[in-house]
């Protein structure tokens, strides 16, 4: 009850202080909603054959995805109520909670396709790796705010964020989940670049990350086979290159305008994970190059808004808000880039979803939380500018 009263109090305060036209970033909100709806339509189409075969219900995954979309909107609204100062205050607790969740996975986790990465919560299999991305972004935003001058000047300070990232990464690699570990590394690297770490240190850190990545690929036979399959997918079209060859066939069939909604052939048990990791291949087949271009444009605009909000925060000397928003922007960009690159054969296949579009409750809900955070940061920036303007007028 107290929580609902706080929501009403905050809303009344916003509407009293801020003109209606300045409540929130409408462009960001509608980009978010449109991508969710595109994802719902695409998942419904892509999952019908798979749902029919497994559950004798063609809309099994579609109904679950619709529930995830509703939960995502609720999550976005709840995260919108939390001030950036609260996120900054809770950064250590959020990070610790993320570590605890990752520690629980080997003991109470649910195995899917041979990997134990999820914790069953009834209707939702929650993936702690998704929460870890948010936890790391929040933690580093607070760390860089507190140690801003130190990170820019001292040589060893750049490796402290790396150690923090490595803690989460080690737990993820036990699942195993190299893809999410790489996302954590990119979030950390992107934020270090924005903070202004010395270029030689930054390059050295990237080189260290690259060496570790190569070592992890070479020391795991299944990763090495997947990498070889990525280099020559048509050499073993029914083996290591099976997913990639069928993904490329889907894009090829779509051509410019696509085969039409529901007319995909590759989703008929030819392309594994059609409604999750390879949703963009089905969109390419059914809506063609134009459909893919529209989705990329929408996500690109959303990322641009995130970066713009981060930049405005830094210009207002609100470093935590700025680093948090920019970290989220790097996260969304890299995950979308890797998923699309994987589907197009530009990158090795990894279990990363396309933001807000692919089927996956954990990914959609956590991504929606980040949108709520961005909307809140943008709103606080607007209030801050209004306050500055009033001071100048006085």
Curated annotation (Swiss-Prot):
Membrane-crossing segments per the record: 28-48, 67-87, 94-114, 121-141, 156-176, 177-197, 199-219, 278-298, 323-343, 354-374
Predominant location category: membrane
Native source organism of the sequence: Haemophilus influenzae (strain ATCC 51907 / DSM 11121 / KW20 / Rd)
Pfam family, one: FTSW_RODA_SPOVE
Biological role stated in the UniProt entry: Peptidoglycan polymerase that is essential for cell division.
GO cellular component annotations of the record: cell division site; plasma membrane
Cytoplasmic topological segments: 1-27, 88-93, 142-155, 198, 299-322, 375-394
Any one of the GO BP annotations: cell division
Keywords associated with the record: Cell cycle, Cell division, Cell inner membrane, Cell membrane, Cell shape, Cell wall biogenesis/degradation, Glycosyltransferase, Membrane, Peptidoglycan synthesis, Transferase, Transmembrane, Transmembrane helix
Phylogenetic lineage: Bacteria, Pseudomonadati, Pseudomonadota, Gammaproteobacteria, Pasteurellales
Its membrane topology: Multi-pass membrane protein
Protein name stated in the entry: Probable peptidoglycan glycosyltransferase FtsW
Record family assignment: Belongs to the SEDS family. FtsW subfamily.
InterPro entries hit by this protein: Cell_cycle_FtsW-rel_CS, FtsW, FtsW/RodA
Recorded coiled-coil stretches: none
Record's subcellular location: Cell inner membrane
Pathway given in the UniProt record: Cell wall biogenesis; peptidoglycan biosynthesis
Enzyme Commission code(s) on record: 2.4.99.28
Molecular function as annotated in GO: lipid-linked peptidoglycan transporter activity; peptidoglycan glycosyltransferase activity
Matching HAMAP family: PGT_FtsW_proteobact
């Amino acid at each position: 009850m107290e929580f609902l009263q706080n929501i009403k109090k905050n809303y009344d305060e916003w509407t009293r202080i801020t003109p209606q036209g300045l409540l929130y970033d409408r462009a960001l909100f509608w980009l978010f909603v449109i991508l969710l709806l595109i994802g719902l339509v695409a998942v419904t189409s892509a999952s019908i054959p798979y749902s029919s075969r497994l559950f004798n219900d063609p809309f099994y995954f579609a109904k679950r995805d619709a529930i995830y979309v509703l939960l995502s909107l609720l999550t976005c609204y709840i995260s919108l109520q939390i001030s950036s100062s609260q996120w900054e205050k809770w950064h250590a607790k959020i990070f610790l909670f993320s570590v605890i969740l990752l520690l629980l996975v080997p003991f109470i986790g649910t195995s899917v396709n041979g990997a134990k990465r999820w914790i069953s919560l009834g209707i939702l299999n929650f993936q702690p790796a998704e929460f870890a991305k948010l936890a790391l972004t929040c933690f580093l935003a607070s760390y860089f705010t507190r140690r801003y001058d130190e990170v820019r000047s001292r040589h060893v300070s750049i490796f402290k964020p790396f150690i923090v990232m490595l803690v989460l990464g080690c737990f993820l690699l036990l699942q195993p989940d190299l893809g999410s570990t790489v996302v954590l590394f990119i979030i950390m690297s992107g934020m270090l670049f924005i903070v202004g770490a010395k270029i030689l240190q930054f390059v050295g850190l990237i080189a260290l990350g690259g060496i570790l990545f190569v070592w992890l690929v070479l020391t795991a036979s299944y990763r090495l086979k997947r990498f070889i399959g990525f280099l020559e997918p048509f050499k073993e079209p029914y083996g290591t290159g099976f997913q990639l060859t069928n993904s490329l066939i889907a894009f090829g069939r779509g051509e410019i305008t696509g085969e039409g909604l529901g007319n995909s052939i590759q989703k008929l048990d030819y392309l594994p994970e059609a409604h999750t990791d390879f949703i963009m291949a089905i969109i390419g087949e059914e809506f063609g190059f134009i459909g893919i271009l529209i989705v990329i444009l929408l996500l690109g605009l959303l990322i641009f808004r995130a970066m713009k909000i981060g930049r405005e925060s830094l210009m207002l000397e609100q470093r935590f808000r700025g680093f948090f928003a920019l970290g989220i922007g790097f996260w969304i960009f890299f995950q979308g880039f890797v998923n699309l690159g994987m589907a197009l054969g530009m990158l090795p296949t990894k279990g990363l979803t396309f933001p807000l579009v692919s089927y996956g409750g954990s990914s959609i809900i956590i991504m929606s939380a980040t949108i709520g955070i961005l909307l809140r940061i943008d709103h606080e920036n607007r209030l801050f500018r209004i306050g500055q303007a009033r001071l100048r007028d006085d």
